[in-house]
Structure formats: C-alpha cells, structure tokens
From Swiss-Prot:
Compartment(s): Cytoplasm
Catalytic reactions of this protein: beta-D-fructose 1,6-bisphosphate + H2O = beta-D-fructose 6-phosphate + phosphate
Gene that produces this protein: fbp
Protein name, as recorded: Fructose-1,6-bisphosphatase class 1
Pfam families: FBPase, FBPase_C
C-alpha cells in the first residue's frame, strides 16, 4: 500500500499539484494524528468535559475543542506557506504577521465534539484556499468553495482515517498507529447515483420547510409510497461520520433550513463544514446543494455564515432541488 507521502508525490507528477500544497497536507495529516492522540487519552487526562465557555457560535466548548483548535493553530503558525487561519472555534481569523504564505487554512478542529464523551466517532475538517497577493485579512477568506485547492477530513473512529481531495478524485488513508503513517486504503471513492438510505435529524421534522417534509415523507412511505422502494434512516450527529458513510456506502445527508434558523440561513457553517464536504462529495460524483443553489457557488458574506445542506447521491439531490424549485429561496 502507498504511504500518504508517496501518494502525494504521484499527485504532483500526474496532476501538477503545487508541492507547497502537498507539504501543507502532510503537516495537516500530522496534526490530525496529534488530535487523535488527545482524543484517545482524553478521559485519562481529564479532558472529556466542558471548557467552561461558549464559542462564537454560541455553543458550549468542550475541552477537546480548545485543545484541538490549539493544535491546528500551532501547526499553521509554524507552516511557512500558511498566511492565516480561520476556525469554527475562533471569532476572528488569525493572520500571521510577517509571513508571505500563499495559502489560507480553514478548519473545524473537532466536529461532533458532543459525541466525544460517548466514545462515538468525531472528526476534523479542513480546507485550503489561495491567499491573495499582498496583504491578508479576514475578508481574504470570503471565497466561494469552488476556489478551494484541497479539502478533507480526519475521522477518529475504530481507526483514524484521512480522506482528502485535491480536485482529482477522493482518496482515503488509514493510520497505522505503530508506524505513525497513513496508508492508502480507499482509493478513488465514489458515491452511487441512487440510494435507499438517508441521514437526517428527525427530531426537527416539525420545523422543516415543505420540500424537505415532502421528500422525507416519501422516503418513509417506502415501497407502498410514490418512491416504490424502502429506505433506511441513519443519524450520527457528526458530519464527518455522515459524509464518510456517503463516500463508503452511498446515501444522502440533509441538514436543511428550518423555521428556527431562517434568519441565519441554516445550521452548518459554510466555510468550515459545507464547502470542504461539498468539494469531496462532488469529486466523488455526488451533488451538494442548499436546495436552491450549488453550495460551492455560494459567495460567503462572513466567516461564520451558515447554509442549508443536502448532499450525496446525485438522483436524490436532484429530486430535492426539483422540490425546492417551487419555493421562494429567500423565505
């Protein structure tokens, strides 16, 4: 099996991926190993509880949220090619003074942290964007997801995996903890166009808009309903785990707009969650939409902007887009 480092050399030769991007990806991989180690020892070190404060999202921070964020930020501050970082856990972007890096790093350092003390799967999500020439500031991060140079996630589960794309397919690597190396175990991941599996938080059903109500009702009706086939529902409450299932087994993942989040545009963060995952899903042959437009075409208005998310099997996402075409996108 190929080591991650060997695979990245191949990418440089076959697709002319910039070597600076590849170096950054290797540093991100090492960072994810460090985060995995902190999670593994979390209970033994007393780091499974709350950090005693809220993040900019108004969510309670776990101690491991803060630790993971510090690990990512420390790596980026030393990485010569990173000019600035933005994190779901930080109110503002951090620009590294005196650095002339070509890239911006965006990350959710610990996705699904509410699951960490239950010993369920959690993850880290990252995205690499081009830095503008000249000075870098917070506005530099407000780029459409289609401009991402690379994106990926680490999944901390029964094994630690790194799944990434540099715009030439999606590939999964599994960590050998004894050697400290990621090996290519899931080359060329793809999402089947059709599926009988959906992932959504059904407890929010009464708040959904009519198109999603209709779609889920048809799925639940199964073989006796208009779809003529039975569906299974899944829900982990960790986006990394949900998207990983899409890439490995297929399906569709929904975190739609609901009546409580209309003013915010949705629940999931565009820069830290929706964009990197949308790039992965599209590179695997799936689709990703807000219901009204392609997620990767959304122009961010702020670092912590939120959007509705529906992604996965092409036929299902197209159906959801069709159902949304009869509704007002501003409602």
């Amino acid at each position: 099996m190929l080591k991650l480092s060997e695979f990245l050399v191949q990418q440089e030769r076959q697709h002319a991926v910039a070597d600076n991007v590849l170096t950054l990806i290797q540093d991100i991989a090492a960072t994810c190993q460090a985060v995995a180690r902190e999670i593994r020892y979390g209970a033994l070190r007393g780091n499974m509880g709350s950090a005693g404060r809220e993040n900019v999202q108004g969510e309670e921070q776990k101690a491991l949220d803060v630790i993971s964020n510090d690990i990512f930020t420390a790596m980026a501050s030393k990485q010569p090619h990173v000019a600035a970082v933005a994190s779901e856990e930080m109110a503002q972007a951090q620009v590294f003074a005196g650095k002339q890096g070509k890239y911006l790093l965006v990350f959710d350092p610990l996705d699904g942290s509410s699951n960490v003390n239950l010993n369920l799967s959690v993850g880290s999500i990252f995205s690499i964007l081009p830095a503008p020439e000249g000075s870098v500031d917070e506005a530099s991060f407000l780029q459409a997801g289609s401009r991402q140079l690379a994106a990926g996630y680490a999944l901390y589960g029964t094994s630690t995996m790194l799944v990434l794309t540099m715009g030439h397919g999606v590939h999964g690597f599994t960590l050998d903890p004894d050697q400290g190396e990621f090996y290519l175990t899931h080359p060329g991941l793809t999402i089947a166009a059709s599926t009988e599996e959906f992932a959504i938080n059904m407890s929010n059903q009464r708040f959904w808009q009519p198109p999603v109500q209709r779609y889920i009702a048809e799925c639940i009706a199964g073989s006796s309903g208009p779809r003529g086939k039975d569906f299974n529902m899944r829900w982990v409450a960790t986006m990394v785990a949900e998207v990983h299932r899409l890439l490995v087994r297929g399906g569709v993942f929904l975190y739609p707009l609901d009546s409580r989040a209309v003013g915010r545009g949705g629940r999931l963060r565009l820069l830290y969650e929706a964009n990197p995952m949308s790039l992965l899903v599209e590179q695997a042959g799936g689709l990703a939409t807000t219901g009204h437009r392609r997620i990767l075409d959304v122009e961010p208005a702020g670092l912590h902007q939120r959007v509705a998310v529906m992604m996965g099997a092409r036929e299902e996402v197209e159906r959801l887009q069709d159902y949304h075409s009869f509704t007002d996108p501003t409602a």
